[in-house]
Every structure is written in structure tokens, then in C-alpha cells.
UniProtKB/Swiss-Prot annotation:
Transmembrane segments: none annotated. Residues 21-34 have a biased composition (Polar residues). GO terms for biological process: translation. Residues 7-20 have a biased composition (Basic residues). It comes from the Bacteria. This is Small ribosomal subunit protein bS20. The keyword Magnesium does not apply. Residues 1-34 are annotated as: Disordered. Gene3D superfamilies: Ribosomal protein S20. It comes from Malacoplasma penetrans (strain HF-2). The keyword Ribosomal protein applies. One of its GO terms (cellular component) is ribonucleoprotein complex.
Amino acid sequence: MANIKSNLKRNKQNRARHTVVHSQTSAVKTQIKKTQASKSQKDLSLAYKKIDSALAKGIIKQNKADRLKSRLALNVAR
């Protein structure tokens, strides 16, 4: 455990940031699974929205977002 004030603060910030990032990542994964199960256009657009939101917030990178969208589109088309 940190003894220095700035390290205590940094740990607190890191825990808070981890919670936010983890929940958003989880929301993206959940929406992707729903879309793969239902294979509907409505769910596909919701998944795109979640992926784009995570991309804008820096949760995932551009290449991963493109890859996820591509794979989802292929899955729904089949």
C-alpha cells in the first residue's frame, strides 16, 4: 500500500478509471453477444453505436473497432 499522498490519490483515480473502462468494455461485449444471437439489423446498429462510443472514449482502438464491426456484419449477413 502506498504511503505517499500523491500515490494514494493516484491509486484511487486508477480504481475509479478501471471501473468505468471495465463497465463500458463489458457493455460492448454484451451487445456483441446479443447481436450474434439475434442476428437482427436493429441489434447490429446498437452494437455499432456501442463500439463507436467506446472508440470515441479511447476504450478500444480504431483497428479493433473496425474488426469487430466487420465480423458482426458478416455474422448478421449469414
